[in-house]
Amino acid sequence: MSIGLDVGSTTVKRVIVEGADVVSEVCLRHLGRPEALARELCTEARRRFPGRPVGITGSIGVALAERLDARPVHEVPAVALAVRSQHPEVASVVELGGQDAKLLFLDRAGDAEMNDRCAAGTGATIDRIAARLGLAEDELPRIRLRGDLRVAAKCGVFAETDCVNLVDRGAAPEEVFAALARAIVLQNLAVLGRGRVPRPPVLLLGGPHAHLPVLAEAWREALGGAWADRGVAAGPVFVPAYAALFAAIGAALHAARGARRLPIVSGVLDEPPAAPAPRRDPRALASLAARDEPDLLGADVAHLHLGIDAGSTTSKLVALDGAGRVRFASYAPSRANPVDDARARLEALARAVERSGGTLRIATLGATGYGADLVAAALGADVALVETLAHAIAARAVVPDVDAVVDVGGTDVKVLRVERGEVRRFALSTQCSAGHGAFLAHAARASGVPIEAYAAHALDAARVPRFPVGCAVFMDTDRVTLLRAGFDAGEILAGLAAALPRNVWEYVVGEPPARWGRRFLLTGGAHRNLAVAAAHADYLREQVAGAEVSVHPHPELGGAIGVALAAMGATHGPTGFRGLDAARAVRVRAETSEATRCRRCDVGCARSLVSVHGGDATPRELVLGNACERGAARDDAVTGRRGAGHAPNGLAYEVARLFRRPPESASARANAPRIGIPRAMGLYRSAPLLLHYLAAAGVPPDRLVLSPPTSAASFHDGAAGGVHDPCFPSKLFLSHVRWLVRQPIDVLFLPALTHARIAVRGTADTASCPIVAACGHTALAALRRDGDELRRRGIRALAPELTLTDPGRLERQLLDAFGDLLGIDERTNRRALEVGLAAQRRFHADCARFGGRVLREARRRGSAVAVILARPYHGDPGVEHGVSTELAARSIPVLSITTLPADEGGLLDLSGILPEATNSGAAEKTWAARAIRRDPRLLAVHLSSFRCGQDAAVASTLAALLEDLDRPSLAMEDLDEDRPGVSFGVRLETFAHAVRRYEAGLGAAREEVVA
C-alpha cells in the first residue's frame, strides 16, 4: 500500500493505492493554500496507514517533497507509470488540467509534449467560459457535440469573448459550448501534436475529460478524421475511471517502488525576485483616485443626456446634465443580448429618478460598444459611435490637451494617440489577454480578498514581487508559486498591479510609451483600482521624462460618457429615442447558426441575422458578422455587386490577376500529369510566372489544380497537423497542402522560392522569408511524420529550389524539376520560361496602371488612399481577414504595394536606409513607406502576422518613416488564425472616421513633399 499526492495549480488530490487498485481518493481546491492542505491530507493518510511510502507530484507538489518527507516525481512519468499499470494497452494519452495540457506517446519511446507558451485549451478556460454562458455545473455533462459554430481557442480570454458574443447574437449556449470543445481539441492537437497524431487506443485524462463527455466526443471526431486521412485503423478513445487522479496514482506507485528522492538543484528554485514597495506621496496618490459612483439625481434634473456602452462583458449607462456632469450611472455584467442589457440599465435610471421625485426626460441618447448598432436600431439612438472615439471624447473633456488615452478594461486594452483632438493612431489587444483587468479580479478572489479591498491590501505591501509579462493564466500559476515562497496576499496583489502596465506597453502596444506622447490619461475599469493606477503612473513616469499622468474621474464609464457627450453635441432637434415604454416593448430576435453562415465567397463569415420589431420601432433586419457588403444581404439571391460607396480595392485587383488561368498551349498534352499547387505563401508573388510556364511547357490549364482561397473551415481541417508553430501563414500552408493531397493529383508542386525579383534596389539581398522558402519542406515533413502519406496516395512530391532573381539559374532549376516529368527539352523549357516571365511582367504593368488610375481619381475627388503595407501572401482573404475589403466598403480606396506605381526619383533606392537588408518583403514595405511619406494623400495600413520575425526587424525603420506624419494610420500587426470581430470592427471604424476627418481638411490642397 502507498500514498500519492498531486498538488497542482488549483487542487490537491490524494489517493491510497494497494497493488494497482485505488482504495481511497480525495480531491479538494486549495484556494491559495496548497502546502497547508497537502500537509493536512498527508498527515491524515500517515495516521491511518503508518509507515507507508508517500509519493508526490504536480506543478507545486515536487517543491513540497522535502518538507513533507515525500518522494517526488514529475507529472509526465507519474502519469505514464499509472497508465501502464491501469491500461497497458494504451498507445497515447491526452491529459487536460487546470492550467496545463500533456500529450504522451507511449508507443514511441515515451515521447511527451506539454503546453509551453499559453494556457489556452485547458480546464481554466472551460470553467470560466461555462460560467459566462450561464451553464450550471450539472448541465455540462449533458451537453453533446452538435452544430457547426466555430470558436478560436488560441487565447482563453478571447475564446470567452467569442463565445459570449455568439450567445448574444442568438446562438444556443449548449451549441456554443460544443464549439468550444471542438476548438480546445484542435488547439491541443496543433500545440501538442506538432504533426503527430495520437494513435489508438487513446486515453483521455484530467478533470475536464472526467466531467465533460462533449470533450471526448470532440476528440473522437477530430482523431477519426485524422486517422482516416493517414490510413490508420480507428480505435477506442475513452475516459477511464479515476481519470482526474492518474498523476496521484503514479506518484503512489513511484513511492511503492522505493524510488530515490530527487536531488535539489541549487539556484533554480531561489526565492523569486522582489523589490521594496515604492514610497508614494499621499497627495499624489489621492490625485489618482477615481471619484465615488455618482448618485446626484434630484427634482431639478429636467433633461438628461444618456450614453450606453453595450460592451461584450459589461453594460453601462450614464446620464449627464446639460453641463456634462455625471448625474447617474448604472453598470452590470452583460447577460442577455445588448438590447435587453440596455433596457435593464434604463429601468435602473427610471427607478432612480422616481425615488428622487423627479420626472424622467431624455434629451439625447448615444450608443457605443460592440452592441451599439443593435441598441441604436432598437431604441432610436441619436448617435452610434465606435468606442475608441467615445473614449477620446471623454478624455478630452477631462484633459483637453491629452496625448495618449490608455483604456484597460476587463478583457481588452486600447491605447489611443490623440493629436489636435483627433485619434491619429491606436493599439488594441486582439490575440492575447495579457494586461487585462479581469485577471486582477480573479486573483483577488483566489487570494480571499474582496475586489473592493484590492488596493488597500496592495498599497500596504512591504514587498512587490516581479511577475513575468505574458499569459494571464500562467501568471496565475506564478501567483500560487509566490504564495508557496512566503509572499502574502497583499504583496502578490501589488506585484500583479505592477505587472499590468508592463503587459500593456511591452506585450500589447509593443512600443515605448514615449512614442505616444507626454500627457497620459488612464481610463477603464482596471484604473478604478488605485493600486493599478499608481503602478501605471509610476511606470509611465519612469519611462517618459516629464510625463503628466492623470486618471479619469469615472474611469469605468469613459465610453458611455464620451458617447453621451457626442450625442449632446450632435443633436439639435428632438431626440430619436422612442421613450421608455417603447424600449420596454421592443423585441429583438437573433439567430447564429450554420444556416446563417455567408456562402458568397470561400471565407464563409459566421453571420448573425437579427430582427428588431415592436415598441414603435420600424421593423428592421440586421446582418452582423459579415466582413464585406456582399454578406450584408440576408438572402442568397443577392449578387456580388458592389455597393454605391464601394471604393477600388487594389489588393483584390492584384489577387484576381495573380491567379488568372493561363491559355492552353498548342503543345498541351492530354496525358500530362495533374499538378497540385497550394494557393499560399510564395505563390502570391510568383503565380503568373509559374502557371504560364507550366501551361507553355505542355500542361493543360485544367490539369493545374490550385487549392481554393483560405477559409476558416479549410484551416481547421488541416492546420492541426503542423510540425512547427512560427506564424499563421505557415500553419495555413499545410491546410492547402492537405486539401490538395485529397484530390486526384499526380504531382504535388512545392517550390522553395528562395529569392524574390523586386523593383527595389540598394539592399544586400532580396531573399524570401526563410519560413516562406522552407514551407514546402516542412509540409512534406508533416505528411511523412506519421507514415508517408504521399506514397500511400501515389503522389510524387516536387520541391525544387527556384531563384527568381537569376533567369539563367532559374532556367536550369526548372529543367531539372520538369524536364523528365513533362518530357521537355532545353529549348521548350527556355521558351516556356520566357512565356512565364512575360506573364509576370504583364501582371506588374496591369497592377501599376490600376494604381495610377486610382491615384488620379483620388486627386480629382480630393480623397485619401489607404496603402496596404503587407507581404504578398496577405492578399489571401483568409490571411488578411478582409481588411482591404472592409476599407473599400467604407469608401476608402485601397492600394497594395504591387499596385502602388513605382515612381522614380530615388525612392526605390534604399542604399541610404537599409543597405544591409536581406529580406524582400521588408525592402518593399520600406519603399512603400517612403512613397507614403512623400504624398499627403497616402495613408499607411500596416498588416503583419502575429509573431512575424521578419517584420519585427524592420519595425523601427517603418516607424521612423511614418510616425511623425500628421495623418491617420492603421496597424493590424497581429493577424492570426482567429478574427476577433469586435476588435476588428473597432479598429476599422476608428480609422475610417479619422480618414473622413482628414479628407475634410485635405480638400484640393496641393501636394507637398515632406522632407
Task: Label every PLM stretch briefly.
Residues 2-43, 111-112, 116, 308-347, ...:
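Short glycine-rich, Thr/Ser-proximal phosphate-binding strand/loop in the N-terminal lobe
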Residues 161-192, 477-506:
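Adenine-nucleotide phosphate-binding core of ATP-dependent small-molecule kinases
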Residues 31, 108-148, 155, 244, ...:
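Glycine-rich phosphate-binding loop plus the immediately following alpha-helix
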Residues 60-61, 193-223, 240-244, 368-372, ...:
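Glycine-rich phosphate-binding loops at beta-strand->alpha-helix junctions
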Residues 72-76, 220-249, 382-389, 537-561, ...:
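Conserved phosphate-binding/catalytic loops in two-lobed NTP-binding clefts
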Residues 179-200, 286-294, 348, 352, ...:
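Phosphate/ATP-binding catalytic cores across multiple sugar-kinase/actin-like superfamilies
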Residues 123-131, 238-274, 393, 437-442, ...:
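Glycine-rich phosphate-binding/hydrolytic loop that grips phosphoryl groups
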Residues 115, 119-125, 230, 432-440, ...:
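An N-terminal assembly and electron-transfer interface module characteristic of large anaerobic redox
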